[in-house]
From Swiss-Prot:
Virion protein with no enzymatic activity. The keyword Electron transport does not apply. Disulfide bonds join C52-C102. Belongs to the Cu-Zn superoxide dismutase family. GO terms for cellular component: host cell cytoplasm. One of its GO terms (biological process) is superoxide metabolic process. This is Cu-Zn superoxide dismutase-like protein. InterPro entries: SOD-like_Cu/Zn_dom_sf (IPR036423). It is found in: Host cytoplasm. It comes from Camelpox virus (strain CMS).
Length: 125
């Protein structure tokens, strides 16, 4: 399981990469964006010393997230990404090729409460 904490200006979120019910998923939530569609992209480096300017070139497009009118995006995407290959890289939230927020992907312990909560969100139970 891997996790990325996003905390840039007023944009905050937590994104998990983990297997759920035998499939690899990207799960989490983001707040602070204007309503609309945004891209989740993994970048070459996990260097955020200069914010999102130092994370290098885009490597993997994860998918689109949709922010509602309240500025909240609930993330639940399928992915083919091998989690072990993205540890230490950066994840960005971007729109129109502009990086709006980013964070470093790190190893996370498995927290059954989080997994249960995120699974509940997907199934609506």
């Amino acid at each position: 399981m891997a996790v990325c904490i996003i905390d840039h200006d007023n944009i905050r979120g937590v994104i998990y990469f983990e297997p759920v019910h035998g499939k690899d998923k990207v799960l989490g939530s983001v707040i602070g964006l204007k309503s609309g569609t945004y891209n989740l992209i993994i970048h070459r480096y996990g260097d955020i010393s200069r914010g999102c300017d130092s994370i290098g070139s885009p490597e993997i497009f994860i998918g689109n997230i949709f922010v509602n009118r309240y500025g909240v995006a609930y993330v639940y995407l399928d992915t083919d990404v091998n989690i072990s290959t993205i540890i230490g890289k950066a994840l960005s939230i971007s729109k129109n090729n502009q990086r709006l927020a980013c964070g470093v992907i790190g190893i996370s312990y498995i927290n059954e409460k989080i997994i249960h909560f995120l699974t509940i969100n997907e199934n609506g139970v």
